[in-house]
Amino acid sequence: MTEAIFEPVIGRYLRLDLLGEPHRLYIEEAGQGIPLLCLHTAGSDSRQYRALLNDAELLKEYRVIAFDLPWHGKTSPPPGWQNREYKLTSQAYTDIIMTVCEALGLDQPVVMGCSIGGRIVLHLALEHASHFRAIIGLQSGAHVEPYYDLQWLHRPDVQGGETCAGIVSGLVGPAAPDDGRWETLWHYMQGGPGIFKGDLHFYTVDGDIRDRVAEINTELCPVYLLSGDYDYSCTADDTRALGRLIKGTEITIMPGVGHFPMSEDPDGFLQYLWPVLEKIRHAEARP
């Protein structure tokens, strides 16, 4: 008989008001030490950070925290959702993150986000630098032009989950292990109707920060950018261009890695992430 083992991850619901409405926000966390707040990609949820939440060495030094945005994963939309269209905006996204940080009492956390999470951390570095120990952007770009018709993501004559997964399937790196590849796609197959499309409103329209990123001061809040080079949504050149605009940014390009480094190949990703986390850990915290 196989031994049953509990993971160290604790999942709970946090009741709080977000954007003026009551929510039950689903949060998972594990470990102790410096808070590391992890933000999932568009149309997915915090399960993308499962491997980080279970990495024994990481948990010795960092309190890893991941939550499902409203309308995503185990966080249900607010009452009356059936009468509205979901569209994520930069202001709403920022307000949600800052409210969660305050509710959890996080003292100078590191915040790490991928894709839309990699975009919003740039907004945080610009507008709330003093609140964060460091910013880590995965697949971060200042803007992206839509490269397919977003209407296909929410149509009554198209199977939404399989369409979303099909669209992002080409963004997974070719060397990703099969289990990581298919778990990443499964999360997309389970997304609510119209949620991926609504997130991409922020990613392609509202979250455009090209004209402002040069104002980010990395002396106030260090910025680290890690990008896989197998990604046509945020190319390595996009990340390099972003780094040229933000003085003092440190960039790591991950060969063969796609758009979802933390879930498609977590073991490979941790080899690139660890040096960054060690540098952050040994840096003196700002008063």
Can you say where each PLM-predicted feature lies in the sequence?
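Alpha/beta-hydrolase fold catalytic core
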Residues: 1-37, 59-63, 106-107, 274-287
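Conserved HGGG/HGGXW glycine-rich cap/lid loop of the alpha/beta-hydrolase fold
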Residues: 19, 23-79
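Active-site loop/oxyanion-hole signature of alpha/beta-hydrolase fold enzymes
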Residues: 20, 65-112, 271
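Flexible "cap/lid" loop of the alpha/beta hydrolase fold
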Residues: 122-127, 131-163
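Conserved alpha/beta-hydrolase catalytic His-Asp/Glu region
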Residues: 146-147, 160-218
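Short beta-strand/loop motif that positions the catalytic acidic residue
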Residues: 219, 225-227
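Acidic catalytic loop of the alpha/beta-hydrolase fold
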Residues: 229-234
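Catalytic active-site module of serine/aspartate enzymes centered on a nucleophile-bearing elbow/loop
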Residues: 249-287
